[in-house]
Amino acid sequence: MEITHRAAVLGSPIAHSLSPVLHGAGYEAAGLEGWEYTRILCQAEELSRVVRESGETYRGFSVTMPCKFAALDFADEVTERAQQIGSANTLTRVDGHWRADNTDCEGALVALRELLGHTLPKRAVLVGAGGTARAVMWALRELGCEQVTVVNRSDRAAEYVELAQGMDVSFCTYDADLESVALQADVVASTVPADVLKQHADQLGHAPVFDVIYNPWPTPLAIRAASNGYPVVGGLSMLAGQSYAQFEQFTGVEAPREAMREALSR
């Protein structure tokens, strides 16, 4: 079969990426013939060259670390949410130019809705303040969250002014009374490595938990929250969720969500 449309994931390391699994399953389920999705090893400083030298058959690129900031700088057009979050995980060819977007925030929205159902969180705890945390903050805002306590080693409130519009955002360190903070929350969302939170899991596991980690799973935080009777959702839900929007931007076809999500369980 002739390959007429291509997409790929860019980053380093890249061998572990599940994006080909997700998009490949989407192509098959949607009946898209002539589509191919691959991995391309790419450092941040190489992104501009790799994308510019890609052939006309390339419709888009999924972008992972360390290339997310370079993708934002490279693009001819940047979506408002990517600008607010400060990084891009999606580059789509549109009428001969490249548009940067961040669909991680949609992935976080999918995961939070899976976790909470129809319940809208009013108060949240967000662990970490990096790029993934900013995507989760966007999702919390979309859900109408009113108050977010960010647990982080440093106070980065100044960086969140635009993103936090309409929300009361405060910062605290890991030395705070995290159990009290968690007990008052409708959801705890963690964006930091599992080992970072291991010693704080007992304190934070007192609310429904969304942990962006999917390997290893379950994390100590998820285990503690589940043992306390709370629902938990891991990073595979976010990974699948962000891929739906990418798939639709690249192909112009509605994502076959169920088939793509099920592909991660094979």
Model-assigned labels for residue ranges:
Residues 145-167:
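NAD(P)-binding Rossmann-fold cofactor-contacting core
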Residues 212-266:
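Adenosine-phosphate binding glycine-rich loop
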Residues 117-123, 205:
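Short helix-loop-beta connector
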Residues 142-147, 228-230:
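Conserved S-adenosyl-L-methionine
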Residues 133-134, 218:
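N-terminal Rossmann-fold NAD(P) dinucleotide-binding loop
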Residues 2-116, 216, 228:
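Phosphate/diphosphate ligand-binding glycine-rich loop within oxidoreductases
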Residues 12, 128-130:
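Glycine-rich Rossmann-fold phosphate-binding loop(s) that bind the pyrophosphate
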Residues 165-234:
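Rossmann-like adenosine-cofactor binding region
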